[in-house]
Amino acid sequence: LAGPVAGTYTLMTDNGFGAQNNSADTLLRLYAVRPDWKTAAGGSGTVSAVHFSTGAAQSSFNAASRITLSDPDRKLGYALQADFTHYYNNAANPLVDASIVSGRLLTGADLDTESARRDKNGNLWFGDEFGPFLVKTDASGKVLAREARLPGVVSPQSPYLGAGPATLGSSRGFEGMAVNPAGDRLYTLLEGTVTGDPARTLRINEFNVDTEAFTGAQWVYSLETAGTAIGELTAISNTEFLVIERNGATATGGGTPFKKIFKIDTTQLDANGRLVKTEVVDLMNIADPGDLNGDGSLVFTFPYVTIESVLIIDANTLLVINDNNYPGTGGRLLGVSDPTEFLRISLATPVPEPGTWALMAAGLLGLCRAARRHGA
């Protein structure tokens, strides 16, 4: 998300250590940062903390640089770690941290937040994979309403699963979510195929911010032959969106990495009623005339498993960021810890210009790396 002042950004951390059953003491947070872009003209290529509300520089990632999600008013409709004496409500486990209980802080065992957007009222919406749920908070991260559920879609981790079968695979929930320019509609993109839907198709659903309900409008996104998942959905206009599509391969294993950004338009459907896709950027083939990463090549590649953020900076510039899948390794080099990399990519064709998209050389304008870290 855009940050508090120009040149800053608001970033969301993943749910913790990669699974619901090992992340009960990981707090769900958003951080405000400022990249110092490494460009052909200079720059350190580092990312630093800023004040979450004012954008003022901070000496470290401290309490002023973040917000922590919480549910002090007990809006969510299911038991949280804060409701238990011991983690996972198991007496054999350690006691739940007192700060989690007293503040009813949300953890990586309560939600797997994968997407976040700010609405017209300044409230935040989080797309979760455990339900999957949409969760509304105020600007401080306090939950304001009961979680919203997509009818007929339930994951194996859902607290509402009961005796019925799951209709969505694990970790296949609201990976992508966009907000329209007016801030009154959200668009969720599932990462996995719902049971009974055609293979390799994903649902995009419209959500009304004012009524806090899904509208019933739905579109079908088809994965490419080489694609296995999506990473993000970002709005260009009321009908046009960017989608990150990828597979699980990296530079060190799993086959040939497939990492691309496509444009879709909800008014443009093929003969099967599925969204027409236009390739915008091949993230494995980005022009790098200044060799910003110093690898000796004039082509920059972005081979990480999960590339999960794309933000439109201006008509010709995209910000793209990967999730380092802490404690993942091997994205670029075997056995080497994966950083989170920030790319500033120049497009030859302006983003808002409808009907003129053509795959043209995308150029790397800036590069930043955030070292692997957890907590703060």
Residue ranges of each PLM-predicted region?
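Short, threonine-centered small-residue motifs that mark membrane-proximal processing/anchoring sites
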Residues: A348-A361
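C-terminal membrane-anchoring or membrane-association module
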Residues: L367-A376
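Single conserved hydrophobic/aromatic residue that forms the stacking wall/gate
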Residues: D128, L359, G375
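Residues within alpha-helical transmembrane segments of multi-pass membrane proteins, especially transporters
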Residues: M360, L364-C368
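Sequence/structural signature of beta-propeller domains
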Residues: L1-P350
